[in-house]
Amino acid sequence: MEIFDLTIHELHEKLKAKEVSSVEATRAMLDRIEAVDSQVNAYITVTPEQALVQAQDADRRIAAGEIAPLTGVPVGLKDIFVTKGIRTTCGSRILENFVPPYDGTAVAKLKEQGAVIVGKLNQDEFAMGSSNESSYFGPCRNPWDLSCTPGGSSGGSAAAIAARTATATLGTDTGGSIRQPASHCGCVGLKPTYGRVSRYGVIAYASSLDQVGPLTRDVTDSALLLGAVAGYDPMDSTSVNTPVPDYVAGLGKGVKGMKIGLPKQYFIEGLDPDVKRAMDEAIALYKSLGADIREVSLPNTEYAVATYYIIATAEASANLARYDGVRFGHRAENARGLAQMYSKSRAEGFGPEVKRRIMLGTYALSSGYYDAYYVKAQKVRTLIQQDFLNAFKEVDVLLTPIAPTPAFKIAEKLEDPLQMYLSDIFTIPVNLAGTCGISVPAGFSAAGLPIGLQLVGKPFGEQEILTAAYSFERETQWHLKKAPL
């Protein structure tokens, strides 16, 4: 097995035993990126010089006996995290040459543990998309089939795990942007509860929905990485001051007696037959492990996509108003006057999907439509949250598909934005409810594309979904399969 194939916990044991150094692991990963990333396009920026300096520092820590779970481990970051001295583009032309003066909290926490940052990963522009096709830096490709998308918006973060060009990655999830690409690329992707991980230093898309989370090769790695970045942060007023448990310690509890709910609105006609088969097999496996499977109802699910695309775009239109060419980012040349400089900078800097969402959001917030759209959407969001809270009075965890289909072809849905939006129908409600969800590899389609299983937990119920995911992973081999790169 190559160094770049190892999980966080496997590499940690080798580093601890001094069987391999962090410099060797980092060089192996940088060589792997050079060998295969031209096919995948998972990275926007690779940082070999900084990575090797961090690796040398990690080796000094290890020699001194100071080794944390992520010390010396090569990780990639979605290009939405601000990184001191490293270009941060958010997949957009408007930030093509932006170099931040500080690290976001999640990045700082990784550095505190001695993780090695090998680069910044491709994504949909400003995290707006489900296929990684809206990136100014070109689409990222799915390592399982280079003609398919890896999903989005954290497409590069998932593709790098599948291509084995990072040991672990961080992404963000606003409406499914960690879980859907994890499903399409055959890796584990966890969206924590809103407020569990600080958003300080994450470029904002929709501030009441965005959440930081890990993408990894297995569930143990997911627990390790979540434990490293979770926790209260005074720099983020929405972060919640609750203790961070040792997620790894609770993985082996098993699911005997666990009540698992199947929301009837998620098992609908139109579900791809391969996805349905994978879900049926997963349900049967949980039954055999002693879980108590029961049907539940989330009656307002049908309104989730419409609600999301009003709230998220409204917040985006406000958040993206700051990009005007004055203090940072792209500035249009040859503008006559300030007003034209604003409009030209934005017209040149933003791509079509971002413009579409800004227009949708501005419309929803405009005085004549504010009550009819935005206020109504917030009321429906409250109903959706209540649906989940009611369901969790009966069950511990929900089991659902992640997406109606496996990964789709590049350009297949570009002409029909609504089809693209609907591909997030099973992930969006979890963000609206503000709770946690995980994608775990659960099989393959007839065409050999990965299929993910979603487990949804109560607010701050990450331990339960990690335990349920680990029990599933232990009984299956899906997470061990490798993309043919």
UniProtKB/Swiss-Prot annotation:
The keyword Metal-binding does not apply. It comes from Geobacter sp. (strain M21). Belongs to the amidase family. GatA subfamily. Its EC number is 6.3.5.7. The active site is at K78, S153, S177. GO terms for biological process: translation. It comes from the Bacteria. One of its GO terms (molecular function) is ATP binding. HAMAP family: GatA (MF_00120). InterPro entries: Amidase (IPR000120), Amidase_CS (IPR020556), Amidase_dom (IPR023631), AS_sf (IPR036928), GatA (IPR004412). Keywords: ATP-binding, Ligase, Nucleotide-binding, Protein biosynthesis. Heterotrimer of A, B and C subunits. PANTHER family: GLUTAMYL-TRNA(GLN) AMIDOTRANSFERASE SUBUNIT A, TRANSAMIDASE. This is Glutamyl-tRNA(Gln) amidotransferase subunit A. The keyword Ligase applies.
